[in-house]
């Protein structure tokens, strides 16, 4: 352990969900009461990564995270670097950062955004055989980035994400 590691603050621990996207995880981590970090940049500053965490929250991964970046983040969030790597797109997979996609049926079971939904070729939830949503089923507002899913609902009409499953179409 070097000198920088000894003075670097450790954040309150937030357990990652299975299949969770890095954007959703970083948003939950920042909002966790023990952390209360106002921005992605503030998290990046603590981890010694600067603005790169802001790109990750917006689902921009070009260039793909390096092992050193993952290890730097792992030091402050107490999550193994290999586990963090699972929250990013697999090497060779093309990700489409917009529109943000959601399977409301999955979200009702586990309230998190899954990285697999953002894969370019992914149009349906394999688990539920439902078409992925790209906007609110009530007001048609596009979904914000997963890091900003604070209330688990549409920020415009307040329909809970989980309730959108009723209007999600079979694929």
Predicted regions, residues:
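A structured, charge-rich N-terminal accessory region that forms the first stable segment of a protein
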Residues: 1-99, 104, 111
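Catalytic micro-motifs at enzyme active sites that drive phosphoryl/nucleotidyl and oxygen chemistry
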Residues: 90-93, 109-116, 120-126
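Short, cysteine/histidine-rich loop/knuckle motifs that typically chelate Zn2+
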Residues: 104-108, 124-127, 138, 156
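Short, flexible loop/turn elements at secondary-structure junctions
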Residues: 107-110, 129, 143, 147
């Amino acid at each position: 352990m070097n000198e920088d590691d000894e003075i670097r603050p450790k954040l309150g621990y937030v357990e990652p969900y299975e299949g969770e996207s890095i954007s959703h995880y970083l948003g939950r981590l920042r909002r966790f009461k023990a952390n209360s970090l106002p921005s992605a940049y503030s998290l990046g500053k603590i981890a010694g990564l600067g603005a790169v965490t802001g790109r990750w929250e917006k689902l921009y991964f070009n260039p793909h995270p390096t092992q050193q970046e993952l290890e730097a983040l792992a030091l402050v969030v107490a999550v193994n670097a290999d586990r963090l790597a699972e929250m990013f797109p697999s090497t060779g997979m093309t990700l489409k950062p917009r529109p943000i996609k959601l399977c409301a049926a999955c979200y009702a079971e586990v309230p998190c955004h899954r990285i697999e939904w953002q894969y370019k070729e992914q149009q349906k939830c394999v688990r539920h055989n439902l078409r992925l949503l790209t906007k609110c089923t009530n007001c048609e507002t596009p979904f914000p980035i997963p890091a900003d899913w604070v209330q688990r609902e549409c920020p415009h009409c307040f329909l809970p994400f989980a309730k959108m499953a009723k209007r999600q179409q079979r694929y």
